[in-house]
UniProtKB/Swiss-Prot annotation:
Keywords: Ribonucleoprotein, Ribosomal protein. Pfam families: Ribosomal_S10 (PF00338). The lineage of its organism: Bacteria, Bacillati, Mycoplasmatota, Mollicutes, Mycoplasmataceae. Involved in the binding of tRNA to the ribosomes. This is Small ribosomal subunit protein uS10.
Amino acid sequence: MAESKMRIKLKGYDHAIVDQSIVKIIQAAEGTGAKVRGPIPLPTEKQVITILRAVHKYKDSREQFDMRTHKRLLEILNPTAATMDILKRVQLPSGVDIEIKL
């Protein structure tokens, strides 16, 4: 018997908010009786932006800023209709992007 699974990928700039969201999703999914595998930490994307400090000259004086995107993967095995309904109603913070694949 092939088991169905739902993959939930969360992204965010603050790892603490992403981890809190994962805990909310796990509690909601386990409340419906579904098995949860994860959270699996995925590689963190790091984007570095370099700008000149001076307006006109002094090219040797630069400043770097970085932006990190933290990602987590969660698998829910054999999700039911109740599991999907509960996951639609979970309130997540505004700094978290969620992607669900069946």
